[in-house]
Amino acid sequence: MAHKKGVGSSRNGRDSNPKMRGVKRFGGEHVRAGNIIVRQCGTKIKPGENVGVGRDWTLYALVDGVVQFGHYSRTQKMVSVIPVTAAETAH
């Protein structure tokens, strides 16, 4: 077995592309239907009311409204969208 590394080989040089995951709309922010709220791997944050789940566990708004984060259980979080009526948005 060789005790010297062969010339011309490199063990480094690999790096994956960034996936741009994370929270995209924070609590209290207004969202339109279809806006992405969270990009995640797995159900780290659970969908609440008026929130849909994409194929890759992306959470998105189903209605126009305001984002609200809360607790799903003692250890898990949940995100909901509280609908806003047209009269409230006029102010």
From Swiss-Prot:
GO molecular function annotation: structural constituent of ribosome
Signal sequence segment: none
Intrachain S-S bonds: none
Entry keywords, A to Z: Ribonucleoprotein, Ribosomal protein
Single GO cellular component term: cytosolic large ribosomal subunit
Region (Disordered): 1-26
Gene Ontology terms: biological process: translation
InterPro entries: Ribosomal_bL27
Domain of life: Bacteria
Annotated family: Belongs to the bacterial ribosomal protein bL27 family.
Protein name: Large ribosomal subunit protein bL27
UniProt source species: Chloroflexus aurantiacus (strain ATCC 29366 / DSM 635 / J-10-fl)
Lineage of source species: Bacteria, Bacillati, Chloroflexota, Chloroflexia, Chloroflexales
